[in-house]
């Protein structure tokens, strides 16, 4: 049977599911979403993963396409750069971009999720909560759903299914049964734990508001993102095992002693530190790659279900949202020829999602180890000087990823070339004034072509 062109079933109402539902509904499709969790608008619950997210150009573009970005401005906080906290309590600010327009935006996962679900329903999508997808028959086009409250199992017709159901995707689980389905997952040896810096006595932020705060300490790191209520959402990254690890911090005394020795300026700001640490779960971080992403024109995987990445480039949300806009671009181009749309979607996206997965792991090392290194910081200044002198040719990798919609694979490839240039141009100098601009010009003209900028 040919898949129906007017009705789409989405699995998962996290972030990608509701956004995709809006984009599809705006084009006249009937959309149903099945979500295993209760409705977070009516039941107090954890967001499940990190409590704050970073929205940048790719995510903003997707929200604009859904007609939602302007309405989001009251729940975001622009972050203009990184505020580094040394172990001595000294602060160093590192701007993200070449000007104040290049910012990333902190947003509550729960607030964003609620806004997306509200908008999806306003556009006519139906969301079924407490309905866990337990399987999908790729031949008959039927999903199996279990009511999480009653345990009742039902079968629903679903001719076209898109799995937006995260790194533990049930739809991917069905695809794993297929011959020649490739799948890999790689966990970091590090975990994370959510903590909180409360607002001040008058509801104010007790640290600089418009910055991502980082306490880099080599093999461990604390970060803090601002919330609109004056609090900061903090995340501690530690190895699971070994010295200075989650395994070694199991009592209030151990936690306080560890923080006082590693993050002394943060301790006075966290009156419930030990209690929060011991009460909150320790999360794991995984990179998932697989192929194919689709089964003919019947089923497709999208977002974390097909390319989960670690959070250190702030691109998880942005990459997933870009999946949605890419899929809709192809749908606009080819109509409901789902087999062709799904095939071209994978061809276009996989090389790019593989690239951001690799860059996210690389950025972990940078955030954890290198952001406090003087030579690294000087090279960042050289990088900005090159961008200013050669606009359209030299764009820092971070900017290509974060402030433009340049394909991730292009950012990765050009980033490697530019890294070699930076090493050569910054070697043996300590001042921007000492850059050999003649050499820079020769390298730029030889190794870089003009870059197509998409913002």
Residue ranges and their predicted role:
Residues 2-6, 329-455:
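C-terminal helical "tail/cap" subdomain of flavin- and related membrane-associated enzymes
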Residues 7, 30, 317:
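Residues at the starts of beta-strands that form the adenosine-phosphate
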Residues 11-26, 163, 195, 281-372, ...:
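Conserved mid-domain beta->alpha element of the FAD-binding
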Residues 16, 39, 168:
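Conserved Rossmann-like nucleotide-cofactor binding loop
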Residues 25-48:
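Glycine-rich FAD pyrophosphate-binding loop
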Residues 29, 68, 125:
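Short phosphate-binding/catalytic loops that engage adenosine nucleotides
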Residues 44-119:
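Active-site-adjacent segment of FAD-dependent monooxygenases/related oxidoreductases
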Residues 118, 122, 131-135, 140-285, ...:
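Conserved FAD-binding catalytic core of PHBH/FMO-like flavoproteins
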């Amino acid at each position: 049977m040919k898949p129906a062109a007017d009705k789409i079933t989405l699995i998962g109402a996290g972030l990608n599911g509701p956004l995709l539902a809006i984009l599809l509904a705006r084009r006249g499709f009937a959309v149903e979403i099945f979500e295993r969790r209760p409705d977070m608008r009516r039941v107090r619950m954890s967001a499940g993963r990190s409590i704050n997210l970073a929205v940048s150009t790719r995510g903003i573009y997707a929200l604009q396409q859904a007609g939602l970005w302007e309405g989001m401005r009251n729940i975001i906080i622009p972050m203009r750069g990184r505020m580094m906290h040394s172990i001595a309590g000294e602060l160093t600010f590192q701007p993200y971009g070449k000007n104040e327009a290049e910012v990333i935006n902190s947003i509550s996962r729960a607030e964003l999720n609620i806004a997306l679900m509200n908008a999806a329903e306003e556009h006519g999508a139906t969301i079924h909560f407490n309905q866990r997808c337990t399987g999908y028959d790729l031949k008959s086009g039927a999903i199996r759903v279990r009511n999480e409250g009653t345990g009742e199992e039902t079968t629903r017709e679903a001719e076209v299914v898109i799995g937006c159901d995260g790194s533990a995707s049930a739809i991917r689980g069905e695809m794993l049964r297929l011959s020649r389905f490739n799948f890999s997952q790689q966990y970091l040896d590090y975990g994370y734990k959510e903590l909180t810096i409360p607002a001040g006595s008058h509801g104010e932020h007790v640290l600089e508001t418009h910055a991502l705060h980082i306490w880099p300490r080599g093999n461990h790191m604390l970060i803090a993102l601002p919330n609109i209520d004056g609090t900061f959402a903090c995340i501690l990254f530690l190895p699971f095992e070994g010295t200075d690890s989650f395994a070694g911090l199991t009592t209030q005394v151990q936690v306080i002693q560890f923080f006082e020795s590693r993050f002394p300026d943060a301790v006075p700001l966290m009156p419930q530190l030990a209690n929060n640490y011991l009460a909150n779960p320790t999360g794991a971080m995984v990179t998932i790659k697989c192929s194919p992403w689709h089964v003919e024109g019947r089923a497709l995987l999208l977002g974390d279900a097909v390319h989960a990445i670690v959070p250190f480039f702030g691109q998880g949300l942005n990459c997933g949202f870009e999946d949605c806009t890419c899929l809709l671009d192809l749908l606009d181009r080819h109509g409901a020829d789902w087999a062709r749309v799904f095939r071209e979607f994978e061809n276009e996206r996989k090389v790019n999602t593989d690239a951001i997965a690799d860059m996210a792991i690389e950025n972990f090392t940078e955030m954890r180890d290198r952001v406090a290194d003087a030579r690294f910081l000087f090279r960042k200044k050289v990088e900005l000087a090159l961008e200013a002198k050669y606009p359209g040719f030299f764009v820092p990798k971070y900017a290509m990823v974060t402030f433009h919609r340049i394909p991730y694979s292009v950012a990765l490839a050009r980033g490697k070339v530019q890294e070699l240039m930076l090493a050569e141009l910054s070697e043996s100098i300590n001042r921007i004034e000492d850059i050999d601009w003649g050499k820079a010009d020769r390298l730029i003209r030889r190794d870089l072509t003009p870059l197509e900028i998409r913002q």
